[in-house]
Amino acid sequence: QRARFIGRVFQDPSKGTCPELTILENMAMAEAKDKHFGLTFGVNRKRLDFYKSQLELLKLGLEDKLHIQVGSLSGGQRQALALLIATMTPIDLLVLDEHTAALDPKSADNVMRLTDQFVKEKHLTALMVTHNLKFAIEYGNRLIMMHKGNIIDAAYEKKDALDVDDLLNQFNQISIEVGN
């Protein structure tokens, strides 16, 4: 019941989509996640136009490739599609589990730009797990670090003034205090 309101994107681009299915089939299945549907699969022209318009948001040219298998896409394309699919239906929480870790820098930047766009446009709460301190500072509005299973709030009030070096120094200081 609660899962209907949670979208998630995994670290591995292949985990958020079905590689043997087409882009169109993946999108139709994602949209039908809380609906009852039978064995008949069909998409009418109105839905097809909607899927194309959603894919245009990615700016990857996928709107012209609806009938290709997702397994033939690059990692960055698959991750952008997984992000789109995760946010296609109304959700409240978007869980991002290192969703840029397996991508090259250009694809990671694109996926983060899309993530920021979708979170803002759809007014989502996002929980992003990342080791990329640059992304954490640039896109996060609250930083929470974990150290040996303990949660550490990283300067909540001063977050906007942090840079990567400040965050690394804070983490190193915590490590020293704990005895590492």
Model-based region annotation:
Residues 87-92:
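A short, proline-enriched helix->beta-strand linker immediately N-terminal to the Walker B motif
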Residues 130-131:
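H-loop/switch region of ABC-family ATPase nucleotide-binding domains
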Residues 1-7, 12-15, 19, 37-40, ...:
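ABC ATPase NBD coupling module
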Residues 150-173:
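Conserved beta-strand-loop-alpha-helix hinge in the C-terminal portion
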Residues 109-121:
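Helical segment within the ABC ATPase nucleotide-binding domain
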Residues 105-107:
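Helix N-cap at the start of a conserved alpha-helix in ABC-type nucleotide-binding domains
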Residues 21-36:
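Q-loop/switch helix immediately C-terminal to the Walker
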Residues 98-99:
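Walker B catalytic motif
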